Curated annotation (Swiss-Prot):
Pathway: Amino-acid biosynthesis; L-leucine biosynthesis; L-leucine from 3-methyl-2-oxobutanoate: step 2/4. It comes from Klebsiella pneumoniae subsp. pneumoniae (strain ATCC 700721 / MGH 78578). Its EC number is 4.2.1.33. This is 3-isopropylmalate dehydratase large subunit. The gene is leuC. It catalyses: (2R,3S)-3-isopropylmalate = (2S)-2-isopropylmalate. It comes from the Bacteria. GO terms for biological process: L-leucine biosynthetic process.
Amino acid sequence: MAKTLYEKLFDAHVVYEAQNETPLLYIDRHLVHEVTSPQAFDGLRAHGRQVRQPGKTFATMDHNVSTQTKDINASGEMARIQMQELIKNCKEFGVELYDLNHPYQGIVHVMGPEQGVTLPGMTIVCGDSHTATHGAFGALAFGIGTSEVEHVLATQTLKQGRAKTMKIEVQGKAAPGITAKDIVLAIIGKTGSAGGTGHVVEFCGEAIRDLSMEGRMTLCNMAIEMGAKAGLVAPDETTFNYVRGRLHAPKGKDFDDAVAYWKTLKTDDGATFDTVVTLQAAEIAPQVTWGTNPGQVISVTDNIPDPASFSDPVERASAEKALAYMGLKSGIPLTEVAIDKVFIGSCTNSRIEDLRAAAEIAKGRKVAPGVQALVVPGSGPVKAQAEAEGLDKIFIEAGFEWRLPGCSMCLAMNNDRLNPGERCASTSNRNFEGRQGRGGRTHLVSPAMAAAAAVTGHFADIRNLK
């Protein structure tokens, strides 16, 4: 029987399945950070259990860390406790930890792929909703809750029901300057923020195949923002070339054998999906969100929509509420909306290609008066590479702040946050009310679009800046 990629991955990991019972899946990789793990480790202690396969669990610090100093006390008492607990727990249970002073420390979804922890064909979980990022490798990756974190630590398995399948095909080639972030925002604009609920999404089409691995990670990172359980891109030569030679990747003949298997990880001809969505890549322009969920998004050249234009009463009410919170009026061109802060970073857009794209816009320009702009690399290796390429100097000379790795202003769990009423052009993944700070107003954009907003002081079409 013809199978989708998701069905192949799921079936390959079923440990036990009985009639009328939820299947038990084997978990190949478990990624851990400081926020969702303390209670899970305490649960192990309470029951006298060990981590079943510590070599398949990798930990880092990211959510709470300061991006201005490596001092563990810098982000407040709760953050200090969570980070100290992670150090204690990893030492006690034999889990590898990339702590604040480790050269590989960084955002968990940047660190995993970078170190070859993430490989095609795997099941990967983490107590974080953006675990879908790793689906870019043709891995079944999804976020789990703290009680599930404990279950995986103790058993290396997890009960999971089968999801519905969705194919999202982006046909043709994207125009120059259109990034993975623009593509995925355009997709969510079409599906809505709940359009993928109950599904695992496979992204395909020429525009997807043309993306680098970093672009595919941006794409899959935001699968959760359309309500999907996970996102997938079938592995190909782009994938294999990225993985080759990384720290935890197979070596020599083992790598060749792995590639032979990975090449089978694709949807069979004749396999059927529950839902199919199609977009034309050539029609996608630079995207900017205007509301308080990622589905409230338009092209930078568009005017802010009138709530009355939505036929669905729920969408209309949501648009009215969003405009009120965002302090915007319908009919205004997005390019007339001024910003206060810019955040370039997060597990969506903090990799080296993202920083290069932003630096290309920043080079030779200055951050607009009254704007604070942060650039936060996703990991120690990304920071080191950016500095080796001189990107830090470009940013600093332009008036951007060059920070240490961490989740930073993506979420208000550390010192980087918006003040009430401040408006931010952000390369992160969520624009919910208060996500970047109480009363903060978040607009999601690509790294180049964020840099353009920083140097102009308002949203600007990057196609007119180059």
